Curated annotation (Swiss-Prot):
A GO cellular-component term linked to this record: extracellular region
Family per similarity comment: Belongs to the RxLR effector family.
Chain location of the short sequence motif RxLR-dEER per the record: 49-70
Organism: Plasmopara viticola
Free-text note regarding domains: The RxLR-dEER motif acts to carry the protein into the host cell cytoplasm through binding to cell surface phosphatidylinositol-3-phosphate.
Protein's name in the database: Secreted RxLR effector protein 39
Signal peptide interval: 1-19
Localization of this protein: Secreted; Host nucleus
Keyword Secreted: yes
Phylogenetic lineage: Eukaryota, Sar, Stramenopiles, Oomycota, Peronosporales
Biological function: Secreted effector that completely suppresses the host cell death induced by cell death-inducing proteins.
Region (Disordered): 229-249
Keyword vocabulary terms for this entry: Host nucleus, Secreted, Signal, Virulence
Length: 280
């Protein structure tokens, strides 16, 4: 029914336009008999030369003689327009009455076509939303436009990254060198440099030299491989043997003399040397 309503409105608009064109092409001729008329009824019978504007402000219906033709044309145009609208409405009603089934069928076809096109329109809209410009790689752009550090040497490589700092390679190389080097000393104790321990060759006789050397190597191996066990063993010995040992007149756990220079030694080494001297 909505389609039929739209058809009726379109017919009304066409009829009104055609009626207006007919009125403009064929204006109605009014006989110039020297009288003023309105709607076919004679209001006043006065000559045009006598008619003029009333000076009384309360008389709102005064008519000037020069506007009679415009008033007649206006009334005739309104009458013709009303007649054209009446005819158009009558024709539309007749069409809707006689061809009502056809109008309903056409409106149903239009709605069906729209429903069939609706999924296609949704797909097109979804594709339009999915197609987006490729985002710019911010990290790559930052590397390309970064200002190089003149203090660091650079090496060009065939990767996406334009430059790689050479000091990174040097750092990895130095790390490998340290890992494959000898025994690393992570922590140090500071003892006076004048506190020197006697060498095993001077103290031990020839028969005990090899035994002491093997013991020293074993202690060093344990200190490298199992530092936690050595530390626990040393602390246990300190609890079982609380007596202080004297070396050259100084106590082992005495506070160091700050006036003497300090020499770094590995952890637990003073206790190892004290134990060895005690065994002798």
């Amino acid at each position: 029914m909505r389609g039929a309503y739209y058809v009726a409105i379109a017919l009304l608009i066409v009829a009104s336009c055609s009626a207006a064109e007919v009125d403009q092409t064929e204006p109605e001729k009014v006989p110039n008999n020297g009288f003023v008329t309105s709607g076919g009824t004679v209001n006043k019978m006065l000559p045009k030369r006598v008619l003029r504007g009333s000076r009384d402000l309360k008389n709102k219906w005064a008519v000037h003689a020069g506007g009679e033709d415009r008033m007649l044309n206006r009334f005739s145009n309104e009458n013709n327009l009303l007649e054209g609208i009446d005819q158009t409405i009558t024709k539309a009603a007749n069409v809707m009455g006689t061809n009502r089934d056809d109008v309903i069928v056409k409106a149903a076809e239009a709605m069906t076509n729209y429903k069939q096109l609706d999924p296609t329109l949704n797909i097109l809209n979804s594709k339009h939303q999915l197609i987006k410009p490729r985002p710019i790689n911010v990290y790559r752009q930052a590397l390309l436009h970064a200002t190089p550090n003149p203090k660091k040497s650079v090496v060009a490589v065939p990767n996406d990254v334009p430059f790689v700092l050479a000091n990174r390679l040097e750092r990895e190389k130095s790390t490998n060198t340290v890992n494959y080097a000898g025994r690393p000393i992570t922590q140090h104790d500071y003892l006076p440099a004048s506190l020197s321990f006697p060498s095993t060759s001077a103290v031990a006789p020839d028969g005990q030299f090899n035994k002491q050397l093997i013991t020293q190597k074993a202690l060093e191996f344990d200190l490298i491989k199992r530092p936690d066990e050595v530390k626990a063993r040393s602390s246990k010995r300190q609890r079982t043997n609380p007596m202080l040992n004297n070396m050259d007149g100084r106590e082992l756990h005495a506070q160091p003399n700050l006036e003497e220079p300090l020499a770094p030694v590995a952890n637990n080494m003073p206790f190892v040397w004290a134990t060895k001297l005690g065994e002798k």
